[in-house]
Regions:
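An aromatic/glycine/proline-enriched structural segment found at the starts
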Residues: 21, 188, 225-282
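Active-site-adjacent, His/Asp/Glu-enriched structural segments that form or flank metal-binding
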Residues: 52-54, 62-176, 205, 210-223, ...
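Short acidic/His-enriched helical or mixed secondary-structure segments at domain edges of catalytic enzymes
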Residues: 162-184, 262-281, 319, 323-328
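Histidine-acidic residue clusters that define the catalytic metal-binding segment
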Residues: 21-34, 122-125, 132, 140, ...
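Mature N-terminal segment immediately following signal peptide/propeptide cleavage
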Residues: 26-61
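Bacterial Sec-dependent N-terminal signal peptides
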Residues: 1-21
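Short, solvent-exposed loop/turn segments at the edges of secondary structure
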Residues: 39, 53-55, 104, 115-119, ...
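His/Glu-based metal-binding/catalytic segments typifying zinc-dependent metallopeptidases
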Residues: 255-319
């Protein structure tokens, strides 16, 4: 009952706030964020923030992921992410990790990355900013992650074993259930056939050129964004970005463009039942497909209203299902 009252109060407050805003109004931008686009198409976002003081975070987002892979390249978006820590043009071998750890940036905790279906992100967190040389090196790393990952043959072969072991470690009942669930939810689309990490046979045997081709095809400046937030001089960082990233070329006019891979609607409910002897509990999940908002609404108030309403309806459905599950 208390939760229901809280929900009503929150919805009432949200309605009052939304009444002051029109759905077609732009979402107010943070005036402290410096936004720019380089001639090669790369975007950057910079913001000064002194909490915590003396530190900053450096990110590069690539708007490409596993769904850009060809069938023969499955797992290579994730494999490429691993290779970014095995040598770049300006920091060969393990020099990147060694330099950062000497300066308090720990591999795994502060230096990391992830790959998903649609994006790949590399990050440096908790970088000390007292020494300008450390900041410059962090920017150089972002530069190298854009276009200058080494992809040395021996390093590629060494990493095969690492990733195959990662796949073996994941391969429990929960992982197998997730793969089956994602395939069912995304049935009829390219997403149905992607699991991000790939499959053992492909990881063992892919040709080095396939990895290089994926890298050069999709790691392009128009699909990349740099985000830097922390105790930094915004003007200095912006000038360094403009200078440092200038050698990243504009993509050729005939470069392949990303496709929009849609998940088709289904006229009848899709039912997927998965059983595994290693499962320790029974789980039921209900997914409801909703049309995505058109891209032109992404930066408008209506997109926030849509997200809030989705969150509340999901929470209400969750509560009701939990109540049913607790009944004798």
């Amino acid at each position: 009952m208390k939760r229901f009252i809280l929900l009503l109060v929150t919805l009432f407050a949200m309605t009052n706030v939304m009444a002051q805003l029109q759905p077609d109004m732009p979402i107010p931008a943070d005036k402290e964020v410096r936004v720019g686009r380089l001639e090669n198409g790369m975007t950057y976002y910079i913001r000064h923030n002194e909490k915590p003081k003396g530190q900053a975070s450096f990110y590069i987002f690539h708007h490409v992921g596993a769904v850009q892979e060809e069938d023969s390249q499955q797992g290579l978006a994730h494999f490429l992410e691993h290779m970014a820590f095995n040598g770049t043009k300006n920091l060969p071998g393990k020099k990147m990790i060694e330099y950062l750890e000497r300066n308090g940036v720990k591999f795994g905790a502060d230096l990391n990355a992830y790959t998903s279906y649609d994006e790949t992100c590399y990050n440096l967190d908790n970088v000390p900013t007292a020494n300008p040389a450390t900041i410059d090196t962090a920017l150089l790393i972002l530069h190298d992650w854009s276009q200058f990952i080494s992809l040395e043959p021996q390093e590629i072969n060494n990493e095969r074993g690492v990733i195959m072991e990662e796949l073996r470690t994941r391969d429990g009942a929960g992982w197998r259930a997730m793969v089956r669930r994602n395939a069912a939810v995304n049935r009829g689309s390219k997403y149905e056939h992607r699991n991000v990490i790939g499959y053992l046979d492909g990881l063992k045997s892919f040709d080095h050129k396939a990895l290089y081709d994926f890298y050069k095809t999709w790691y392009r400046p128009e699909y990349q964004a740099i985000v830097i937030v922390g105790d930094i001089d915004v003007d200095r960082i912006e000038n360094k970005i403009k200078t440092l990233m200038a050698d990243i070329p504009v993509s050729p006019a005939d470069a392949p463009q990303k496709e929009a891979y849609l998940v088709p609607e289904n006229e009848e409910p899709t039912v997927s039942i998965f059983s595994d002897p290693e499962m320790t509990a029974s789980v039921m999940r209900l997914f409801i497909k909703r049309p995505a908002l058109p891209k032109q609404y992404n930066n408008l108030i209506i997109s926030q209203m849509y997200d809030v309403l989705n969150s509340y309806t999901s929470a209400m459905a969750n509560d009701r299902m939990n109540e049913i599950a607790m009944q004798p």
